[in-house]
Amino acid sequence: MSFSSDTKNELSRIYPEDRESKIAELAAIIRMIGSVSFYGNNKLSLTLSTENASVARLTFKLLKDLFKVAPEVMVRRGKYLKKALTYILFVSDTKAVRDILEETKILNRERGHVKLNYGIDRKIIRTVKMKKAYLRGAFLGGGSISDPEKAYHLEFVTHNLEHGQDLSNLINSFNLNSKVIARKNSYVVYLKEGEQIVDLLNIMGAHNALLNLENVRIYKEMRNNVNRIVNCETANLTKTINASLRQIESINYIKKTVGLDYLPPSLREVAELRVKYPDLSLKELGKMLVPPVGKSGVNHRLRKIEEISNKLKERRVQ
């Protein structure tokens, strides 16, 4: 099961306590997975389709609890490779559908006319609890979250721009920074920052998903830190080895052309130790000198040796 499915299963187990929050959550679910059919004699029907069994069960429970409606339930198997099951809830009673749509503020009556409301009615989200319930319903109906091992991405897919913008504004009312983009015939409201996704999961009540995502974030951060340290140490080691090889080359050139006795005693001592112990650090070489010399002192002497070697090479060229 995917991380997204696990998150939906967790959220679908949260059942709102008060009627207002139930209405808000159901309104969001209908917005995301519902379709309304109008036909002769002012008749209405409502169809809700989802591939998640937990979401179907929750939606059924909300409809029955709030409106005493028991939707007809159908299950269809997909035709393609995965052959996923689709759960369909169908309400055919016109009065029940009208009651549902009017109370969820999807259908408004104005001067005797019925009008669809494509945005989020402010009355549905007038309290913090109702806002959280709406976001939970929107995620259950049309949300998804990427596996945090691969990427940080949470999104809601809606079929109406006005609803997408209202949903983004609702998310951002919690000091988040969601964006809206068009994708084919839909609109996607999304978050891409791990910290903001964690905050939204907390707002919706998906605490297990939140903890799992945080664990992955911490692990990835630790892994990245270790990689940075290893890369830094590797770079430093490469730099040290290259410097040692360069120093030994200079010492051997002096030895071959004029002999190490050409060097002052302090430089000759360092030269002999460097050739004998090519893997030692400057600090370790310094401790072996009599008297001991610090890292900067050893570095200074080795630089002097390289300068002498370079001058000898220049003379030879001349």
Curated annotation (Swiss-Prot):
Gene Ontology biological-process annotations: cell division; regulation of sporulation
Key word Cell division present: yes
Domain of life of the source: Bacteria
GO molecular function terms attached to this record: DNA binding
Keywords, sorted A to Z: Cell cycle, Cell division, DNA-binding
Record family assignment: Belongs to the WhiA family.
Name under which the protein is recorded: Probable cell division protein WhiA
Species of origin: Caldanaerobacter subterraneus subsp. tengcongensis (strain DSM 15242 / JCM 11007 / NBRC 100824 / MB4)
